[in-house]
């Protein structure tokens, strides 16, 4: 279990079917998704080197891509997106009066979400020139950019193979075509958001509104797909079900809040908790929300200084980073950004309440109640 989840006061020891706390669900789902990813890699990825590189990325192999003993494996992420889809799936089933589904019908889709997310991380690390991911060397820093691009491409293709999964059998797969289409749409939106993010690096006219449009694609597209797709499978592919827009809105708002919190951690997060060097976003002059808010709120002199620093074409020095931090503190940029994260969290909870059929129904549905708790964690996490 990633260190960032330790603040969720519980012990992960129950199965997904009987779990009663958020951390129980997350632990059970993560174990199930990891097992499914391993099966997908074995069944779909023929090249052993690619399987090794992917296993390394997930923390299951060393830098030589040789599998590690279970006790030595690194934490490979939170499995947040699969958990979102599975909790929405089970929550929507519960709302219809059905018992928790032990047949794993939503597992292939949840697995595909995690593979798409990780393909994007491998490519993001290349584009951002990041040397660390989850406290370990990034894939590209070990095998080079060209091979790492190929590893990411392999993961993206494997995601769609995973989504088909056992639904290839006759009679299975109600709604599978729709969630595959949703996953493809989310992938396209993610690339559009990433293009905007890269474009921001060389522009000096980026606004807060442009930022929100960017993260709606880069981050929120996949969380929207997760919550919408999970609910859609529970409603057996009934695309016109009135609850589905609320599930989609929940995922979108949660994804927006998640990315804003990520921006805060990119400046003020601790390396021991984020797995990345503290202040990396400042040194790369990323126009994240705290910086854009500072440019909007700063005095003319401070705005000019910050603009000049972010117009540089090289990574900032230590003194220059300190200057940026001083300006951000003067403008209370961290608190302002957190307000935006909290606002999106509140909007996510409102949408979730609508999806549940009201506040009482939300509290009475253990899966959706866990999503309520997860929303609070996402917008206040430290890693």
Language-model segment annotations:
Residues 116-133, 257-269:
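Acidic (Asp/Glu-rich) catalytic motifs at the cytosolic membrane interface
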Residues 133-155, 204-218, 245-249, 271-297, ...:
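Divalent-cation-assisted or electrostatically stabilized phosphate/pyrophosphate-binding catalytic cores
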Residues 44, 170-174, 298-306, 360-361:
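Structural helix-adjacent loops and short alpha-helical linkers that scaffold large soluble proteins
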Residues 44-51, 74-79, 149-150, 157, ...:
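All-alpha helical catalytic cores of prenyl diphosphate-utilizing isoprenoid enzymes
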Residues 2, 52-112, 162-163, 209-254, ...:
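Alpha-helical phosphate/pyrophosphate-handling elements in metalloenzyme active cores
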Residues 48-53, 131, 265-274, 303-308, ...:
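A glycine-biased, small/acidic residue-tolerant capping/turn segment at secondary-structure junctions
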Residues 1-112, 122, 126-141, 197-199, ...:
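Conserved N-terminal diphosphate/IPP-binding helix and adjacent helical/loop segment
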Residues 53-57, 112, 129, 182-186, ...:
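Short acidic/histidine-centered micro-motifs embedded in hydrophobic/aromatic stretches
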């Amino acid at each position: 279990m990633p260190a960032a989840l330790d603040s969720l006061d519980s012990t992960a020891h129950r199965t997904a079917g009987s779990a009663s706390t958020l951390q129980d669900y997350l632990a059970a789902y993560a174990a199930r998704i990891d097992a499914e990813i391993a099966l997908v890699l074995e069944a779909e990825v023929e090249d052993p080197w690619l399987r090794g590189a992917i296993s390394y990325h997930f923390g299951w192999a060393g830098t030589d891509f040789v599998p590690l003993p279970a006790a030595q494996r690194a934490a490979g992420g939170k499995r947040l997106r699969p958990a979102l889809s599975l909790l929405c799936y089970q929550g929507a089933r519960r709302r219809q009066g059905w018992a928790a589904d032990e047949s794993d019908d939503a597992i292939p889709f949840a697995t595909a979400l995690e593979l798409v997310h990780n393909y994007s991380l491998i490519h993001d690390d290349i584009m951002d020139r990041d040397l660390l991911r989850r406290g370990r060397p990034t894939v590209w820093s070990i095998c080079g950019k060209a091979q790492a691009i190929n590893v990411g491409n392999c993961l993206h293709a494997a995601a769609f193979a995973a989504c088909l999964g056992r639904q290839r059998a006759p009679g299975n797969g109600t709604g599978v075509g729709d969630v595959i289409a949703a996953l493809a749409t989310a992938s396209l939106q993610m690339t559009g958001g990433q293009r905007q993010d890269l474009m921001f690096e060389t522009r000096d006219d980026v606004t807060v509104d442009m930022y929100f449009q960017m993260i709606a694609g880069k981050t929120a597209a996949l969380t929207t797909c997760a919550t919408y797709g999970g609910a859609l499978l529970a409603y057996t592919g009934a695309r016109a079900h009135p609850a589905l827009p609320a599930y989609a809105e929940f995922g979108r708002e949660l994804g927006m809040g998640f990315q804003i919190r990520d921006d805060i951690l990119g400046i003020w997060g601790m390396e021991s908790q984020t797995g990345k060097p503290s202040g990396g976003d400042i040194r790369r002059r990323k126009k994240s929300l705290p910086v854009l808010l500072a440019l909007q709120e700063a005095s003319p002199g401070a705005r000019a200084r910050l603009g000049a620093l972010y117009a540089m074409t090289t990574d900032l020095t230590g003194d220059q980073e300190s200057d940026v931090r001083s300006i951000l503190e003067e403008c209370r940029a961290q608190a302002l950004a957190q307000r935006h994260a909290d606002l999106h969290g509140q909007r996510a909870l409102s949408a979730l309440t609508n999806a549940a059929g009201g506040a009482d129904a939300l509290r009475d549905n253990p899966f959706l109640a866990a999503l309520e708790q997860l929303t609070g964690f996402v917008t206040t996490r430290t890693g």
